Amino acid sequence: MKRAFSTIYICLLAFLGLQAAQVDTLLVHSESMNKDIKVLAIRPDKALKGEQCPVIYLLHGCTDNHEKWLKVRPDLPEIADREGIIFVCPDGGYDSWYWDSPIVKEYCYETFISKELIAYTDANLSSIPDRSKRAITGLSMGGHGAMWNAIRNQDAFGAVGSTSGGLDIRPFPNNWGMKKYIGERDENLYVWNNHTVINQLDRLKDGALAIIIDCGISDFFYGVNKAVHERLLQLKVGHDFIARPGGHNDTYWNNSIDYQIKFFKKYFEKE
């Protein structure tokens, strides 16, 4: 189920000697979609030596691919070694929004992310096979995808994040290819209402997931992120919410991912 066609060895000098995180671009087969999906995997030195490590799944935004997060943070291999964390960055099909589409039956990205990819990672990448050592986050479309998958698959993920996420899709009926997968909004309002993260929040109980959400105050998604924060407060679901200066761009995400990794690291260590 795996074929490595690009391997990069990143050599890093650390306090305890020379370490080498490994970056692989893999092909992971999806039975639900009957195709291979490109996945960028970053394994720390300790995982390469056989020690099981926690894993963070990083989802990209619309029009990007599995390489996006490494472009945003080229030092992810160094972070992997320093923190002892595996990073797994799947290709999200350009504009899939990480749903199982009710219209395009061959688009089953929720099934791939929350079932098939986890099974592959646990079997092949030396990850700890337990939800308490598994987190998922993403930027923009990927923030939506991370929250969507974690809320609906709480047996799979223990922690979830979103940075600049499109957490309520309904104000954007003609953007980012969404209507290809769930139809025109005004003609399929029931489907749109049921495929937006903000309407999935009722599935949550306080403490069921460790949650961190952040968004720049100049981001066009800031309003929907604030609305999700307020809804979580109404539901009395604990979460971290960060609003700070910034827009919808790599500069913001280069900084915001640090806060999310620290949040997940603390979560992994408390179990």
State what each model feature region is.
Residues 7-17:
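Bacterial N-terminal signal peptides
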Residues 1-6:
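Positively charged n-region of N-terminal signal peptides that target proteins for export
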Residues 21-271:
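Non-catalytic cap/lid and distal C-terminal segments of serine-dependent acyl enzymes
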